[in-house]
Amino acid sequence: MVNSQGKITDSNPVPNHVLLNGLTDKAEKNQGIGNSLCSQYEEKVRPCIDLIDSLRALGVEQDLALPAIAVIGDQSSGKSSVLEALSGVALPRGSGIVTRCPLVLKLKKLINEDEWRGKVSYQDTEMEISDPSEVEVEINKAQDAIAGEGQGISHELISLEVSSPHVPDLTLIDLPGITRVAVGNQPADIGRQTKQLIRKYILKQETINLVVVPCNVDIATTEALSMAQEVDPDGDRTIGILTKPDLVDRGTEGKVVDVAQNLVCHLKKGYMIVKCRGQQDIQDQVSLAEALQKEKDFFEDHPHFRVLLEEGRATVPNLAEKLTSELITHICKTLPLLENQIKENHEKITEELQKYGSDVPEDEHEKMFFLIDKLNAFNQDISSLIQGEESVGEDESRLFTKIRNEFHKWSAVIEKKFQRGYKAIYKQMEKFENRYRGRELPGFVNYKTFEIIIKQQIKELEEPAVDMLHTITDMVQVAFGDISKANFDEFFNLYRTTKSKIEDIKFELEKEAEKSIRLHFQMEQIVYCQDHVYQRALQRVREKDSDEEKKKKTSSMSHDEVSSVNISLSEILEHLLAYRQEATNRISSHIPLIIQYFILQVYGQKLQNGMLQLLQDKDTYSWLLKERSDTSDKRKFLKERLARLAQARRRLAKFPG
């Protein structure tokens, strides 16, 4: 028996309730290795392992990693023999790859029962097993059903549950043996496929990697340990299992002891050494119970390996105890993180599911209300947008902010057009004065010159105003389209109908807005301002136009140029500046008003009314609410994930800890 410190306390043989290479030997069931393996864990072990097994059965592993022990090894490393010794059942054996699917081996110790029970689960199949001899056959059937009858492999799990008073409380994941060369009907890239499957499991930080290595090979060259070191370079979550110590060449036993004592290739969790049934033992029909007794005798009598037994590093019972202890410690360590991950995933999926909404009702009456809700939500988003109250991301700007920026640019364009250099204005006025001044004496303002200049300057602003209209219209159309996508993306016909309305209304209102803008500029060709308004503006210009500023205006001109500028030109300039102030105020405000009215207010209102008109034709409800093919599948997928995680949260909440 093995005590809690892993030492041998007596030499009683282990029970004889084992398989004899597919046959059952029921001669002795009075005491089993499991009786001594988990005595200190009776209240803690099973609940911990059951919790993780139940989460795995729920499919939570599809969403996040669960604590596990994964068993890996090269072909012919003795991996199957180790698992047989732990479980008491024969697993598939033979040449080539015999483990073709990941096998979740759930061992459950029965305290007050003697009856052996087994269950194989895969896909939608669940097979109860009453005799251990049936396990190998059922596992092979499951692998053929999942991976085909050839030599291919699959990532899909097979679950084998063994309940017996003679097994430890333990869950292991057996992975295919590592192969290098395709044999027989195996795919040419079987080596790559196998390593890819193994790496998928051992890469996870939640997995303890159980690496099986024969004693009679150089440990540094084994592929399994090399793969484990790639994903766990510090050896924090790797346990080495040394097998076949009876095949070690004479004189090399000391090297094996050094490896087992963690002196060669260091692993923080260390090494164990076991001697399981070999092929000859199987042919001689040596039972697993007999094999365990022979293993114990082997280590007790071996001059080199006896020390490993004394240190608790040898035999299958000690291995079972260590694995159970490591798994429980690992589960307890990862539970808080697991609980947080499940909570975060639950919240994330809940939020994602909201984007897909609820299922479309089958009842026509309910379908109408469903469509009304959809249209109202869309119209509310449009209202928020045109009122400048829509929700945006941290690094995003509201539509109205973007439009306001365009209006600021428009004001800058006006200033740039009006504020030409004084020298250029004087030259322009001089040209008009020479061309249009008639019989007036110097000092009399030529109104024609003033009128032509101001009309020309205002006319130059018309096309920039129309360009601004097109820019803002495109911005609004994109924003409306984004709202349509956010609300109706899963309903292809409704989304397409909405986009069509957005485009049609845009085309109509953009034409109306452009017509209004051009009409405004036509009216601006009438030079007009209220008398009292103009007089105040002219007075401000004249007060500002001091002698010093006049000097600055003409300082860049030559003496000849200054002498050619007469009093009438100065007078025209003052009138131009005065009128420009009032024209600037009108144009800089009125053009944005036109755009806001047509491209925000009317556009939004017409779109909202157009969407509500869809309710008038009841025959189109089903057509409008026809979902994209992937939408319902995605919603179903998210609901299933949410249900899994919700169940997982409830089970974690009930766990005593």
UniProtKB/Swiss-Prot annotation:
Biased composition regions of type Basic and acidic residues, renumbered to the chain: 540-551
Q: Name a GO molecular-function annotation.
A: GTPase activity
Map out region (Disordered) in residue numbers.
540-559
User: Region G4 motif: which residues?
Assistant: 243-246
Instruction: Identify the stretch(es) annotated as G2 motif.
Output: 98-100
Q: For this UniProt entry, what's an example GO CC term?
A: exocytic vesicle
Segments for region (Critical for lipid-binding): 550-553
- Location(s), subcellular: Cytoplasm; Endoplasmic reticulum membrane; Cytoplasm, Perinuclear region
Annotated region (G1 motif) at 73-80
Q: Region Middle domain: which residues?
A: 362-529
| Function as written in the Swiss-Prot or TrEMBL entry | Interferon-induced dynamin-like GTPase with antiviral activity.
Entry similarity comment? Belongs to the TRAFAC class dynamin-like GTPase superfamily. Dynamin/Fzo/YdjA family.
Question: What's the subunit arrangement here?
Answer: Homooligomer. Oligomerizes into multimeric filamentous or ring-like structures by virtue of its stalk domain. Oligomerization is critical for GTPase activity, protein stability, and recognition of viral target structures. Interacts with TRPC1, TRPC3, TRPC4, TRPC5, TRPC6 and TRPC7. Interacts with HSPA5. Interacts with TUBB/TUBB5. Interacts with DDX39A and DDX39B.
For this entry, the protein name equals: Interferon-induced GTP-binding protein Mx1
This chain's source organism reads Canis lupus familiaris (Dog)
State the encoding gene.
Answer: MX1
